[in-house]
Amino acid sequence: MYSKSRKIQSVVVMLAFMILAASAWGGAPARAESGVSEPYRIVALGDSLTAGYEHGYTEKSVPYGYVEQVYEQSLFHGLRAEYVNYGILGLKAEGLNRLLEAVSGGRTVKADDIQKELQDPRKETLAAQTAQMAKSIRSASLIVLTIGGNDLLPVMTKLDSGATAEEITTYIQTILDQYEKDLEASIRTIAALNPKAQMVMSDQYLPVPAPLQFGSTTIELYPEAKRKLLLDGVTKLRGKLELVSTRLADDGIKLQVADVSSLFVGHELEYTSIAQGDIHPNHLGYAAMGRAFATAIWGDYRTIRPRQANVQMSVVVAGKELPASAAPPVLRSNRSFVAMRDITDALGAKLTWNNATQSATVSYNNHTVILAIGSAYVTIDGKKVKLTTPPAFLLKSGKESKTYLPLAALSEALGLQVTYRGTLQTAFINK
């Protein structure tokens, strides 16, 4: 896959990179207290695929790429997760290696010290973050990575120059030999900084579709001879990844390879913006990448159940969605409320109801929380605190009335992580 816009004949044309918003740790930070799990920290490194770039993005765009989907999958698995994304548009393997050398050596660098003519408008800001990158990598539980598409970028120019197939093949081999060296050096640097982190990177997909067949008529969207040469390059890049992974394994360093390329075969027009002249994935393509990474990391890809039209959101507690029999969650003033018994059962918390005071006492994880219907205050471990949400309330559900509690206020008071993902319309509660 070529992680930079470039000229392709017919429908495939040049498109310049646009600005992505800077990334920082995502998700709520874990609270340092007894009984609370250590955070599951995800660090993302690499090129524009890691940055989550899509066709038409501007500096105000919020990425929703494979990294964000890996983060969501970690929440689905009951992990108290957070993430940081250091993806740089236009980055090549050599640039990644230089960046990581600076990170490891504790040096502050400028963008040109990493790679000349980087296309990312955030390049100086990102290059200056070597100290933060080192801290992030050292504390990471999982490191995800994409790199290689930009290394093959010069092949397009070579193809347009009229070079022979033999010359192109030799040229690709030269590029990939250097790619192999830079990639291995990068992974070894990461492993030296954090030998315990799980490392997963993807292979590269080819965005150029095969010829379309309509009866006896064949339509080439791109010259087939050239497409096959590009496909050969992508295939050989996968081979280099496997060679590096094998050598690293011999030294006790595990690098997993997520199979992205096969998922795009036959879906190039569906999963990318190639018809608009941009080779980057669209939301469907990034979802496919997310599935590939999640499968490599956890062995599955999780989703929520389809919601009925009257259900505003879903709730996942410690990796399990509230059962279909649970009362539907309710949104009030953009805050989530759940039926009292449903959430306490899901947590395994002790619940006591005081009918006289119309209050619920929830005990869990060495915390005791008291919420009263209509009260603007909550009592947390004996201390009265003003709610920042609407108060608990009664709501008729079928033939009975149910007590609804403010989800975030209750969960945070119990020392839990609460994360709402608008992309999924789902609240995740993790220990």
Regions found by a protein language model. Name each.
Residues 101-174:
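Oxyanion-hole/transition-state-stabilizing segment in secreted/luminal serine hydrolases
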Residues 31-100:
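Serine-esterase "nucleophile elbow" of acetyl-processing enzymes
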Residues 89-116, 271-280, 366:
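Charged, often glycine-rich, active-site loop that binds/positions anionic groups
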Residues 207-308:
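Catalytic His-Asp segment of secreted/periplasmic serine-dependent ester chemistry enzymes
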Residues 31-38, 123-143, 187-196:
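Short amphipathic alpha-helices and their capping/turn segments at secondary-structure boundaries
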Residues 25-32, 291, 295-431:
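Primary recognition of N-terminal secretory signal peptides and signal-anchoring hydrophobic helices
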Residues 2-32:
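Sec-dependent N-terminal signal peptides of Gram-positive bacterial secreted proteins and lipoproteins
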Residues 41-46, 50, 82-87, 141-146, ...:
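Structural recognition of the beta-strand scaffold that forms the well-ordered cores
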